Amino acid sequence: MTNYMFILSLLFLTGCLGLALKPSPIYGGLGLIVSGCIGCLMVLGFGGSFLGLMVFLIYLGGMLVVFGYTTAMATEEYPETWGSNWFIFSFFVLGLFMELVVFYLFSLNNKVELVDFDSLGDWLMYEIDDVGVMLEGGIGVAAIYSCATWMMVVAGWSLFAGIFIIIEITRD
């Protein structure tokens, strides 16, 4: 499981680097879509099946349409790729190298704690004698309607504002 999450985190950061170093709008959208899908797989890997599915459906349902529309408006006959400009490609390779260096430095201390599981008492569905059973699907529904309500409102508002920002940028 650790190797699975490590590979997913490297792919997630690679997608984020691809987004940050976009030579053409098509590849920026591709990097964002890859990062979003792999982020949802990371949520699934930590046991959040409902939350991972909801984020995946909302993300692909909403933002994929926006990126498809904007890349259709900003198409070029010969788009520049990541490998066509050595300056951009060198930053991409440098970013990947820095990811590996940071991971190596964190693994030297053996004190890497990705997720803090100390305050899970609120999320237990059924508890007998200090043993709690956690249902993943129900936890996702509870998280959306309890503590993540404002986060969902902010995410929806960000998507709504992002549509207008992208349309204004690509408008003639």
Swiss-Prot record:
It is an enzyme of class 7 (translocase). GO terms for biological process: mitochondrial electron transport, NADH to ubiquinone; mitochondrial respiratory chain complex I assembly; response to cocaine; response to hydrogen peroxide; response to nicotine. It is found in: Mitochondrion inner membrane. It catalyses: a ubiquinone + NADH + 5 H(+)(in) = a ubiquinol + NAD(+) + 4 H(+)(out). The chain crosses the membrane at residues 1-21, 26-48, 52-74, 86-106, 147-167. Core subunit of respiratory chain NADH dehydrogenase (Complex I) which is composed of 45 different subunits. This is NADH-ubiquinone oxidoreductase chain 6. It comes from Rattus norvegicus (Rat).
